[in-house]
Amino acid sequence: MNAWLLSVLCLLGALAVLVEGVTVQDGDLSFPLESVKQLKHLREVQEPTLMSHKKFALRLPKPVAPELCSQSAFPEALRPLCEKPNAEEILQRLEAIAQDPNTCEICAYAACTGC
């Protein structure tokens, strides 16, 4: 009976970890990996607009954080970072993970937990 109860508790614990999934942490903020992956798709949609105005883009780099945060498809879980003064830097780090999320899924980044 005790072995069966212990097995059930272990199984429930493993299930809880799987349901929570992989979390990406940046400072005091943490985000689900699935939300971070959505950044890649948002940037792919945004790229054609930036490329069509190439000659203007060479003058001054335009911050992408306000533009990304204002999109309706921007993940709700990432919204708290939009209010941070260093949102641009945080987005750059998250985009690096979004470009190759497999490395986060195997916990190659120190910022990723829950593997």
Swiss-Prot record:
Alphabetized GO MF terms: guanylate cyclase activator activity; guanylate cyclase regulator activity
Disulfide bonds: 69-82, 104-112, 107-115
Alphabetically ordered keywords of this record: Disulfide bond, Secreted, Signal
Key word Thylakoid present: no
SUPFAM superfamilies, per database record: Proguanylin
Pfam annotation, one family: Guanylin
Signal peptide: 1-23
Protein origin, superkingdom: Eukaryota
Propeptide: 24-100
Places the protein is found: Secreted
GO cellular component terms, A-Z: extracellular region
Expressing tissues: Intestine and in low abundance in adrenal gland, kidney, and uterus/oviduct.
Task of the protein: Endogenous activator of intestinal guanylate cyclase. It stimulates this enzyme through the same receptor binding region as the heat-stable enterotoxins.
Family: Belongs to the guanylin family.
PANTHER family: GUANYLIN, GUANYLIN FAMILY MEMBER
Protein name in the entry: Guanylin
Organism whose genome encodes this protein: Rattus norvegicus
Gene, per the UniProt record: Guca2a
